[in-house]
Amino acid sequence: MTAISEALSGITDHQKAHVLAEALPWLQQFRDKVVVVKYGGNAMVDDALKTAFAADMAFLRTVGIQPVVVHGGGPQINAMLGKLGMTGEFKGGFRVTTPEVMDVVRMVLFGQVGRELVGLINAHGPYAVGISGEDAHLFTATKRTVMVEGKPTDIGLVGDVTTVNPEAVLDLIRAGRIPVVSTIAPDSDGVVHNINADTAAAALAEAIGAEKLVVLTDVEGLYTNWPDRDSLATEIDVDALAQLLPSLDAGMVPKMEACLRAVRGGVPTAHVIDGRVAHSVLLELFTGEGIGTMVTPGPTSPTEGVAS
């Protein structure tokens, strides 16, 4: 089954024609543009969602859009730690990474999660190539701390991306490939750090001049007053988001920080979407209403832009 057939499976031929016709303005708008997609959450553990996501990436490449995938691997890392009798701990939304945990993170991200995703995409053609933040000096990291109950807290070998050397990724894009990036990176002394995938995706999107950053999550989008489900925001600008960040649930903070960084760094829009919905990336890019929450540089008017 081709990527296009996979993406349009389950609907009639008439509906397929309507969907493709409706998508035309967005196909034109995003042709030859780079879209960075952070792959994570339930989308990377459910087999049907994994297959749908891979088809979406191949679809984008087929219609002339240039996807770059940046992936985490939280569920798989947790599973491997459990098999090895090791415990996992989170503080401030980030994994506490000891040297022993770092060995597992490195093995799982590049050797398991990345390889599986490359294989799923390449079922549609020889498109995807795996790369890690260590390769060709793609990322350089510095150790970070997080605020827990108002205090800076050490979380081990966890880093922030401080420099990006995007040439290896740009070379792959120019060759018609889909880069699949594992988020591990050395510091200036060569010590490898675990990089939050949301953080890495934002830094890469900024460095390569992406048109969009799309972050997959396990919720419908950003709730400004969780758990009030009526507080789901379809759009928020960077100033409003910056004010809201301190009050967000710890798990959402890295995702929204990533969107904030990307848009402030020149990416036109960033999006948090529900990765539990099959083909959610296509719904965001190619439908008028989009899906999830869009982060913008400033308030937008209803007539601004063609797509969300």
Swiss-Prot record:
Site residues, Transition state stabilizer: 38, 255
> Which GO MF terms does the UniProt record name?
acetylglutamate kinase activity; ATP binding
Q: Which EC numbers does the record give?
A: 2.7.2.8
| Biological processes, Gene Ontology terms | arginine biosynthetic process via ornithine; L-arginine biosynthetic process
Per UniProt, substrate binds at 73-74, 95, 194
Q: Which Pfam families match?
A: AA_kinase
Reactions listed under catalytic activity: N-acetyl-L-glutamate + ATP = N-acetyl-L-glutamyl 5-phosphate + ADP
List keywords of the entry alphabetically: Amino-acid biosynthesis, Arginine biosynthesis, ATP-binding, Cytoplasm, Kinase, Nucleotide-binding, Transferase
Principal place of residence: cytoplasm
The record's family statement is:
Belongs to the acetylglutamate kinase family. ArgB subfamily.
Q: What does this protein do?
A: Catalyzes the ATP-dependent phosphorylation of N-acetyl-L-glutamate.
Protein name per its UniProtKB record: Acetylglutamate kinase
